[in-house]
């Protein structure tokens, strides 16, 4: 594609931009964002890369969801589900729109989730995946853990789902 087309018709463009507003930010999900989030992740749900969620599921846990925006357009999402009684948190619903992949936004959201988990005071953050094994292990340096390391209620839900997800996690040393 030409530079002018890229500049005019993408959120990122190719030139220098000066403005007073935050161009790229991670913010809490708003209720009015839920339909867009569901539409955005739909293909990955069909491909079994993400767990199926509906409006009510997300609305019930809306405080756990965050979106990455570029110029006020949602380009990615992540959820941080706390399990305080197990001193752990789950990184879930990690997704970047296809045209924004390869720009480090997945890493940005994973690091954001880790910081949120640290703020919660938990000792362990984990992600469940059957398709992003190499991403979590090789790029994010998450170690592989047994399913026994999961909070009991999360383990039950995983077993009931029938998904063959691996468990990848990080011990958060600063909270010990």
Regions found by a protein language model. Give the residues of each.
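Short glycine/proline-centered loop/turn elements that form peptide/ligand docking sites
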Residues: 110, 131, 135, 149-155
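Conserved GNAT acetyl-CoA-binding A-motif
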Residues: 116-130
């Amino acid at each position: 594609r030409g530079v002018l087309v890229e500049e005019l018709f993408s959120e990122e463009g190719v030139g220098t931009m000066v403005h007073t507003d935050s161009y790229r930010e991670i913010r809490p999900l708003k209720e009015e964002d839920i339909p867009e989030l569901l539409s955005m992740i739909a293909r990955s749900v069909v491909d079994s890369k993400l767990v199926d969620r509906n409006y009510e599921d997300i609305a019930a846990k809306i405080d756990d969801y965050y979106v990455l925006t570029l110029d006020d357009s949602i380009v990615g999402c992540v959820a941080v589900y706390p399990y305080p009684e197990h001193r752990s948190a789950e990184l879930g619903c990690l997704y970047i729109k296809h045209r924004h992949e390869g720009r480090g936004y997945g890493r940005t959201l994973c690091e954001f989730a880790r910081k949120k988990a640290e703020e919660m005071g938990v000792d362990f953050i984990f992600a469940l995946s059957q398709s992003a094994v190499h991403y979590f292990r090789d790029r994010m340096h998450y170690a592989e853990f047994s399913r026994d390391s999961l909070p009991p209620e999360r383990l039950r839900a995983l077993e009931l789902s029938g998904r063959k997800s691996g468990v990848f996690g990080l011990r958060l040393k600063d909270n010990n």
